[in-house]
UniProtKB/Swiss-Prot annotation:
It holds the Pfam family Anticodon_3. Zn(2+) binds at residues 139, 142, 152, 155. It catalyses: tRNA(Met) + L-methionine + ATP = L-methionyl-tRNA(Met) + AMP + diphosphate. This is Methionine--tRNA ligase. Binds 1 zinc ion per subunit. One of its GO terms (cellular component) is cytosol.
């Protein structure tokens, strides 16, 4: 199962967002399908909480109208990027509410949810509750100035807004009022031993995730799971369910979305129990993809919720209504994609929206850039100069030129894939290189090393270009047998390289498949489908689903068929104007030196 962090539905998403949750998860999922594994890739829009209400006020919409608006925008953009979700849904469905409440009740029955009187942050100007993440100040532990009210991204410690030094609202900069209020808490202290033991076994995670988990084990204290709001999942307890201004905290219901989306997917496929193969089968593997600001929720809180439901916390308890659910196997967290050294920010105007980018450059250029030059292990600055260089040199000159030269010459001289005659050592050496790359590239992808995987695939492309330049088939008119052997070798390696690059470049991979005479679906794309809510039929919304079982791409070198008709190619990737690297498009923010 590929569980992808849920984009927040308070506005369109920018390329910094999809560099963390979007492209890496799809590259991984496409590879796993090609390798013959059953994959369930799920996510959706996160639609509850104060930020939705605040943005709705700004736009003069109701909270539901705003959620509907950006749910559609985000769904359309992720479809355009080619993210192959088995289900991309939303958190305002009847199915999600039911699943969240059932897991809440299981945790409550097992004693992992407790009431506490606490201090809540209120905006003096609006009277509205401020979510912890919307309060910023100085961390009392490490002194970091940009700590949030829920955690410090610098030291990884969990915080309470009232603990911050000089706390201010991130919405309008005012100092919040702190008032007493009663809330429900997830008793994380009741998972100190069980969760700590589990985290100690996660030695293979990325270093940035392991850094945070070390602090998590030392800071296991109760964490609020309710808020004074009227927009969210109702609390299914006597004395709470009828309170109009008490709802489950957005972070609590959002992480449960991975499971509720799996249940919804199963219901929509006509087999309501299909989710069990990914959640209760001990052999199933769960991979979670996100940006680094979500590590705590996935490495500490979500495992604790699952343990509490399963009766596996320090207090024990009964197994919940869904059976014993699997804990995460891998948490794949990316760092931040920045611009001019700063995080992408809508409020500061440092933002490149996915929709704008796709309209001008198409999906595969962005997918490739994020894969080979994105923030896999450290914060990475996006520059137009680097983007133009990668597109022009690697995609257009290297990969596009290899496809064009190989297919054009074979189509012109033979009209079809020529038969190899008397292959030489150089031919076999190149074919061996491309065959062996499947194990190397696949190994990197299995370990979520996307940069290394893309670079290794491009090494095959570079070797094939050198081979063509060395063999000079355009000079072999008087030796057609040798020319055909060279062109057959080149076409075979183009076919292999196209397979190796398919997880990164699924749209152009389909085109190369067809240029090589292939028919049918090589690399399937997600479909936007209009559906009715399974539990509230009068509500309709868009989802992403797809028929990925129909695609032909498989993770192996397949011998190219002699005599297969070839088609005259058109450029795979258009070269970009070098001046674009200096200024970027007119609609893009100006880079600061």
């Amino acid at each position: 199962m590929t569980a992808v962090a849920w984009p927040y539905a308070n506005g369109p998403r920018h390329i910094g967002h999809v560099s963390g949750f979007g492209v890496p998860s799809d590259v991984f999922s496409r590879y796993q399908r090609m390798a013959g594994n059953r994959v369930l890739m799920v996510s959706g829009t996160d639609e509850h909480g104060t930020p939705i209400s605040v943005q709705a006020d700004k736009e003069g919409l109701s909270t539901r109208e705003l959620a509907d608006k950006y749910n559609r925008v985000i769904t359309e953009d992720l479809q355009g990027l080619g993210l192959s979700y088995d289900l991309f849904t939303r958190t305002t469905t009847g199915n999600h509410y039911e699943v969240v409440q059932q897991i809440f009740l299981a945790l409550h029955r097992n004693g992992y949810i407790i009431p506490k009187t606490t201090t809540g942050a209120i905006s003096p100007s609006t009277g509205r509750t401020l979510p912890d993440r919307y309060i910023e100040g100085t961390c009392p532990i490490c002194g970091y100035d940009g700590a949030r009210g829920d955690q410090c991204d610098n030291c990884g410690n969990q915080l309470d807004p009232a603990e911050l030094i000089n706390p201010v609202s991130r919405i309008n900069g005012e100092k919040p009022d702190f008032v007493e209020t009663e809330h429900l808490f997830l008793d994380l202290s009741a998972f100190t031993e069980s969760l700590g033991k589990w985290l100690s076994t996660r030695t293979g995670w990325r270093s940035n995730v392991l850094k945070f988990t070390q602090n998590l084990v030392e800071d296991m204290r109760p964490r609020a799971i309710s808020r004074d709001l009227d927009w969210g999942v109702p609390i299914p307890l006597d004395g709470w369910r009828d309170q109009s201004m008490k709802r489950l905290y957005v972070w609590f219901d959002a992480v449960i979305g991975y499971f509720s989306a799996s249940v919804e997917w199963a219901r929509r496929t006509g087999d309501p129990d299909a989710w069990k193969q990914f959640w209760t089968d001990p052999s199933a593997q769960g991979y979670y993809f996100m940006g680094k600001d979500n590590i705590t929720f996935h490495a500490q809180i979500w495992p604790a919720l699952l343990m509490g439901h399963n009766g596996q916390g320090d207090k024990g308890g009964e197994v919940g209504p869904y059976g014993q659910l699997n804990l995460p196997d891998e948490i794949v967290s990316s760092e931040f994609l920045t611009m001019s050294g700063s995080k992408f920010s809508t409020s500061r105007g440092t933002v490149i929206y996915v929709r704008d980018f796709l309209r001008e450059f198409g999906p595969d250029t962005l997918r490739y850039f994020i894969s080979v030059a994105g923030p896999e292990n450290q914060d990475t600055d996006f520059t137009w100069d680097e983007f133009v260089r990668r597109v022009n040199f690697e995609l257009a000159n290297e990969w596009g030129n290899l496809v064009n030269r190989s297919v054009s010459m074979a189509a012109k001289n033979n009209g079809a894939v020529p038969a190899p005659t008397s292959p030489r050592a150089a031919d076999e050496e190149l074919k061996t290189l491309s065959r062996n790359a499947f194990e190397t590239v696949g190994g990197h992808l299995q370990r979520s090393r996307f940069k290394a995987a893309a670079q290794e695939a491009m090494r095959v492309v570079s070797a094939a270009n050198k081979y063509l330049s060395d063999q000079e088939p355009w000079k072999l008119k008087e030796d057609p047998d040798r020319r055909d052997a060279v062109l057959h070798t080149a076409l075979q390696v183009v076919s292999d390289a196209n397979t190796l690059l398919t997880p990164f470049l699924p749209h152009s991979a389909q085109k190369v498949h067809e240029l090589l005479g292939g028919t049918g679906v090589w690399s399937a794309q997600p479909e936007l489908r209009e559906v009715s809510d399974l539990d509230v039929p009068e509500r309709e919304y868009p989802v992403l689903m797809g028929d990925y079982a129909a695609e032909q791409a498989s993770w192996e070198s397949t011998e190219i068929e002699v005599g297969r008709p070839l088609h005259k190619p058109t450029p795979l990737f258009a070269k970009l104007d070098a001046a674009l690297g200096e200024t970027g498009p007119e609609w893009a923010p100006i880079e600061k030196s």
